[in-house]
């Protein structure tokens, strides 16, 4: 076997290695799966990203790749020692998704960046749904919002479903977790809050620099944070029956940010 292997050219050896399916050990499966939980992500300073689009975006950014697992040869630019071809059954074992994509990557959690306390800033008060947070970060990327401030109760940025929903925008928006009450009290920027009752956002003369607070999916902005709001704004309803209780927080964020950017 050694003789046969030595008889192959360098290029042929590369192609053989490229297409060999690696076995993922039980310990590897256990470790990668453990990163689905926040406490293990924090302990190991690692998180997972799934899908070609998301992984491509992260590879182009300053995120550092720990290892890449794919069911087919992809990402030729990634060093061979940092990637493995694995079976679909093994991918299902390590994926956080109900229907896994064809690749999963483990990245290092970067060091927190300083807060950019200028321009238009979005503050999130206790957003709990991973899909909502991911979509909101994608919206911030679209509208050029460089800084998002999250309350300490907001869902973890590196939750696999958050990362997936950002579609790579996680690499272009600075997200900081703080004591939101203290942050707002110490900021010199005007603070706007979204409520069911408030000034019609379409009729407001909105500033270029401000903090916009979006509240929890079920309860809105908490009383503690409400006390720091300087201006209450609302998205008016136009339906005749007026039966819809509220907008999804991500949908509301899209409308609000669009108005601030007009």
Predicted regions and their residues:
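Boundary-proximal intrinsically disordered activation/regulatory segments immediately upstream
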Residues: 19-72, 155
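Glycine/small-residue-rich loop that forms an oxyanion/phosphate-binding "nest" at active or ligand-binding sites
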Residues: 84-108
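Structured adenosyl-cofactor binding patch, chiefly the S-adenosyl-L-methionine
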Residues: 142-143, 162-171, 223-262
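Amphipathic alpha-helical repeat scaffolds
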Residues: 51, 128-135, 244-250
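Active-site/ligand-binding-proximal alpha/beta "capping" segment
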Residues: 193-243
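RNA substrate-binding interface of SAM-dependent RNA methyltransferases
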Residues: 60, 114-197
